[in-house]
Each structure stands twice: as C-alpha cells, then as structure tokens.
Amino acid sequence: YFAIQTRKQEISEKEYSSLTEDEKRFYQRNLTKKGNYSLNQAAKNAGVKNFDKFHNAGYKGLYNGETADDIAKRKGLRYREDILDNMGSEELAANLFRITQTESRLKRDKVDTEKKACDTHNKIGKIVRKAIRQAGRNYARRIAYT
C-alpha cells in the first residue's frame, strides 16, 4: 500500500514540476478556492460574521499590514477584480498555507469568537510571512505576479 502511495506521489510531483507557470497557477488557484471555502466554514463555526474583516486579518499578517484592497491597488487591479486570480503559483501556495494552517488552528484551539478568529488568522499570516523570509525568499510586499 505505502509503496503504491509513494509512487503516486512521485508521479504527481513529476507531473507538477513539468507544468507551465500558468498551469501551476491554475492548479494552485483551484486548491486555494477549495481551501477558502473550508476556512469559511471553520470561521463561521468560530463565530465569524464579518468575513471581510476576517480575511483581511489574514492578508494583513501575510502582507505586512496590507488589506485585500491595498494589495489590489498595489497590483493595479480594477474594482472587484479578485486578487487571488492575479497571483502566481508561489504566492498562491503561500496563501494556501496560510488558509490551511488558520483553519487547523481555529478547529484545534476551538476558537469561539470573531475577535479570536481574526487574531488567529493575523498571527498565522505573520508566521507564514516569517517562514518565507527565513527560507530566503524576498517576500516583503514585492511578490507581485501580475
């Protein structure tokens, strides 16, 4: 069983590495969309009512204080154009990591208020940002794949 699963993973990694940047971006965007849906469910269970505030808390952590609107302006996007649709695969992967880790923390810590959920999302965003910086990636607000 494990040998088969390992082989499937090797094939998946090989296939992923052969994708173009646009294909990787599309793949990561779909994962991010599913992750956000799941995160929203966990946030709702934690008492979140203002989802814009909740999502901005995560963006502020990851993007050094920037809200979704700030990111959109920096990227030169039109009103209501989705910032996630205008990210490269690496930036989407960073956001997916923020999303999955926040969902996990909300559930594990049994977060039960909107304030705690927003604080948790912001903290996870900062942790992801710090990890990227420590890995040697110059992420400081310049990761703009438009």
Predicted regions and their residues:
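Positively charged, phosphate-engaging catalytic surfaces used for nucleic-acid and nucleotide handling
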Residues: 1-146
